[in-house]
């Protein structure tokens, strides 16, 4: 049983071991939820950030991520789309802001950013979103040091680059990019002064040990990622994981709660697969530390609750919308 006075939960750490994370992940659920709530209340207010996600360029990705319908290796029937023009993207951002979102995330189905007109347009989009008074986030694969610096100069708030799963299970999910490639990308983002958005997916066929290992990598980043998206697999026909069954909502609750304990100040984002959770399960996730959601009826190529449904949910829960920009009080190890 967790002792709420336990010193190992009293400060922010960067030296978590896989075995102790696995122990936390497997605690009796009521104890795990209790400890996560204590830590969440200690380090955060009960506010939820509303982030809107838009697919700027859809389909045709050269990576072979087995969960993704945008991969050229997938036979799913998604409608590919070339990169939208700057004006169209900014109009979408304006709509998201009008609906209440304060963070606009833009996704490109790329293996990596390439210099040229598409990248220059990306920079314009970032500047335009910031001029609207919103946080700007980009997810577009790997990038160079110079590209990261140019994005920082454009005012990019955060760059998303997920680890997906544990280092050990990773080879079962993707082989066209290494785990180290992902870590190097995150390092470049951090070195450029851009906030890091980095999380993973559960329900890929991994076990609890893999989940603990993923959380070990994330929680030992120094500083912690400012945002940690926790996704559950949305099995899409035509992808390599189309036969995977939905995870139980308790597994998502455990993952959210454990992430909150390990990374007390990070925004823990309840992400893909949220539509499959009951209203009650989502409320428990908020109680256990989730303080950000993707807001709007679509996440890249998967569905999501509507603006109206989410506004009603948050009103029923009684949490406030978080309008504090992600400048984030970064706690860094002094060791």
From Swiss-Prot:
<dbReference type="GO" id="GO:0051537">
    <property type="term" value="F:2 iron, 2 sulfur cluster binding"/>
</dbReference>
<comment type="subunit">
    <text>Homodimer.</text>
</comment>
<keyword id="KW-0093">Biotin biosynthesis</keyword>
<feature type="binding site">
    <location>
        <position position="197"/>
    </location>
    <ligand>
        <name>[2Fe-2S] cluster</name>
    </ligand>
</feature>
<feature type="binding site">
    <location>
        <position position="137"/>
    </location>
    <ligand>
        <name>[2Fe-2S] cluster</name>
    </ligand>
</feature>
<dbReference type="InterPro" id="IPR007197">
    <property type="entry name" value="rSAM"/>
</dbReference>
<feature type="binding site">
    <location>
        <position position="61"/>
    </location>
    <ligand>
        <name>[4Fe-4S] cluster</name>
    </ligand>
</feature>
<keyword id="KW-0408">Iron</keyword>
<dbReference type="GO" id="GO:0005506">
    <property type="term" value="F:iron ion binding"/>
</dbReference>
<keyword id="KW-0808">Transferase</keyword>
<comment type="function">
    <text>Catalyzes the conversion of dethiobiotin (DTB) to biotin by the insertion of a sulfur atom into dethiobiotin via a radical-based mechanism.</text>
</comment>
<dbReference type="InterPro" id="IPR010722">
    <property type="entry name" value="BATS_dom"/>
</dbReference>
<keyword id="KW-0411">Iron-sulfur</keyword>
<keyword id="KW-0479">Metal-binding</keyword>
<protein>
    <recommendedName>
        <fullName>Biotin synthase</fullName>
        <ecNumber>2.8.1.6</ecNumber>
    </recommendedName>
</protein>
<feature type="binding site">
    <location>
        <position position="105"/>
    </location>
    <ligand>
        <name>[2Fe-2S] cluster</name>
    </ligand>
</feature>
<dbReference type="InterPro" id="IPR002684">
    <property type="entry name" value="Biotin_synth/BioAB"/>
</dbReference>
<dbReference type="GO" id="GO:0009102">
    <property type="term" value="P:biotin biosynthetic process"/>
</dbReference>
<feature type="binding site">
    <location>
        <position position="68"/>
    </location>
    <ligand>
        <name>[4Fe-4S] cluster</name>
    </ligand>
</feature>
<keyword id="KW-0949">S-adenosyl-L-methionine</keyword>
<keyword id="KW-0004">4Fe-4S</keyword>
<dbReference type="Pfam" id="PF04055">
    <property type="entry name" value="Radical_SAM"/>
</dbReference>
<dbReference type="InterPro" id="IPR013785">
    <property type="entry name" value="Aldolase_TIM"/>
</dbReference>
<dbReference type="GO" id="GO:0051539">
    <property type="term" value="F:4 iron, 4 sulfur cluster binding"/>
</dbReference>
<dbReference type="InterPro" id="IPR006638">
    <property type="entry name" value="Elp3/MiaA/NifB-like_rSAM"/>
</dbReference>
<comment type="similarity">
    <text>Belongs to the radical SAM superfamily. Biotin synthase family.</text>
</comment>
<dbReference type="InterPro" id="IPR024177">
    <property type="entry name" value="Biotin_synthase"/>
</dbReference>
<feature type="domain" description="Radical SAM core">
    <location>
        <begin position="46"/>
        <end position="274"/>
    </location>
</feature>
<keyword id="KW-0001">2Fe-2S</keyword>
<feature type="binding site">
    <location>
        <position position="269"/>
    </location>
    <ligand>
        <name>[2Fe-2S] cluster</name>
    </ligand>
</feature>
<dbReference type="Pfam" id="PF06968">
    <property type="entry name" value="BATS"/>
</dbReference>
<comment type="pathway">
    <text>Cofactor biosynthesis; biotin biosynthesis; biotin from 7,8-diaminononanoate: step 2/2.</text>
</comment>
<dbReference type="GO" id="GO:0004076">
    <property type="term" value="F:biotin synthase activity"/>
</dbReference>
<feature type="binding site">
    <location>
        <position position="65"/>
    </location>
    <ligand>
        <name>[4Fe-4S] cluster</name>
    </ligand>
</feature>
């Amino acid at each position: 049983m967790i002792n709420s006075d336990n010193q190992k939960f009293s400060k922010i750490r960067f030296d978590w071991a896989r075995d102790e994370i696995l122990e936390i992940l497997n605690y009796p659920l009521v104890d795990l939820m209790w400890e996560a709530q204590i830590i969440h209340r200690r380090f955060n207010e009960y506010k939820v950030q509303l982030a809107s996600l838009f697919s700027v360029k859809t389909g045709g990705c050269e990576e072979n991520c087995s969960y993704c319908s945008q991969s050229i290796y997938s036979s799913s029937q998604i409608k590919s789309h070339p990169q939208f023009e700057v004006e169209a993207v900014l109009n979408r951002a304006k709509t998201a802001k009008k609906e209440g979102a304060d963070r606009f995330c833009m996704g490109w189905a790329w293996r990596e950013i390439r210099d040229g007109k598409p990248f220059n347009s990306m920079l314009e989009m970032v500047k335009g979103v910031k001029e609207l008074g919103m946080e700007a986030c980009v997810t577009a694969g790997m990038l160079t040091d110079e590209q990261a610096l140019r994005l920082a100069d454009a005012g990019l708030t955060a760059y998303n680059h997920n680890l997906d799963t544990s280092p050990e299970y990773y080879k079962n999910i993707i082989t066209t990019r290494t785990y180290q490639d992902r870590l190097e990308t995150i390092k470049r983002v951090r070195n450029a002064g851009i906030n890091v958005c980095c999380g993973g997916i559960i329900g890929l066929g991994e076990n609890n040990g893999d989940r603990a290992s993923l959380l070990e990598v994330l929680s030992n980043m120094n500083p912690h990622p400012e945002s940690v998206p926790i996704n559950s697999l949305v099995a899409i026909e035509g992808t390599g994981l189309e036969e995977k069954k939905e995870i139980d909502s308790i597994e998502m609750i455990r993952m959210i709660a454990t992430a909150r304990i390990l990374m007390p100040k990070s925004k823990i984002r309840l992400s893909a697969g949220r539509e499959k959770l009951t209203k009650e399960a989502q409320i428990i996730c908020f109680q256990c530390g989730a303080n950000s959601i993707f807001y709007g009826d679509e996440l890249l190529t998967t569905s999501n609750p509507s603006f109206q449904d989410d506004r009603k949910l948050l009103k029923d829960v009684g949490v406030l919308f978080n309008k504090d920009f992600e400048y984030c009080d970064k706690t860094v190890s002094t060791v």
